[in-house]
Amino acid sequence: MTFSLRFTADLIFALAARAITNKNGFPFILQLSPDTDFDTGAAALSASMPRVDNGSSQSSTLVPRYRSPILWISGSEPLDHPEVPRFTNALAASGRHVFLQTSGASLKRRLHEFQPSSRFYFAIHFDGLDPLPDRSSACDAPFRVGIEALRMARLAGFFTCAHLVVRPGAEDSKLEELHAEISKLDVDGFLLTRSALSPELERNVNRLRRRLLSRRWALLSDLVESVALPAASRNSRQTGRQPLSESQPDNFEEGAEAG
């Protein structure tokens, strides 16, 4: 499972940029939510940006104001917002790496609105799910929805990753089973993040990353976690952040790595 050369280069750059704010005044990874960010930005972008005929059903491409190289789109459920596909396509076309987190429940009816791109990933969210529940149980529904969403997106030519959220008390064996089950779909990668600020949970997640993820996906998981954690947790986390070793960029060459 590999990244594109451009994405690999951007992740290497993250090793130098992660401890400080970018000199241009924007973070390396920016979290956006259609609940709060897209509605207010749409009017301004539509009024100020030229319309470009891209030969598709989408009448224009909006060049975004967001300068961060990686954009993480999340929220209650991004696919419930009608403007998300247009914004996502425009952000990816502008040169940003875009990750759209979704449960996958609405993906079947919205998939045709998105454009495959080497800069765009569907990040299917698996939060505290038992990977092998009783198949006759209702609790299996979210897991099956996520699996089907990954399968649909892959068949349609999109890059995909599974975002596994680790909660306190989660068993390593369960996460490993979930990772193995999803790996059968030949997804492009995995993100592994914790649900809350906890030293014990952090140790557990770091151990799982070393065991299950490549260095690139482990780094991206850490970057995503820095914006996905609750605000209070992020502030405390940044205070105690330790920089990665300068020797680590050498470990980010292209190659087939697990996770």
Task: Briefly describe each language-model feature range.
Residues R18-Q58, R65:
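Canonical Radical SAM [4Fe-4S] cluster-binding loop centered on the CxxxCxxC motif
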Residues T36, S48, F126-D130, R194-A196, ...:
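Short, histidine-centered active-site or binding-site loop motifs used for metal coordination
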Residues S195-G259:
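A C-terminal junction/extension of Radical SAM enzymes
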Residues M1-G25:
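Membrane-proximal basic amphipathic "stem/tether" segments
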Residues F13-N22, Q31-D35, T88-V98:
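N-terminal/domain-start segments enriched in small and hydrophobic, helix-friendly residues
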Residues G41, G55, E83-V84, K174-E177, ...:
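Residues at alpha-helix caps and immediate loop-helix transition turns in enzyme cores, especially N-
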Residues S59-I73, H81-R194:
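Radical SAM/AdoMet-radical enzyme domain recognition
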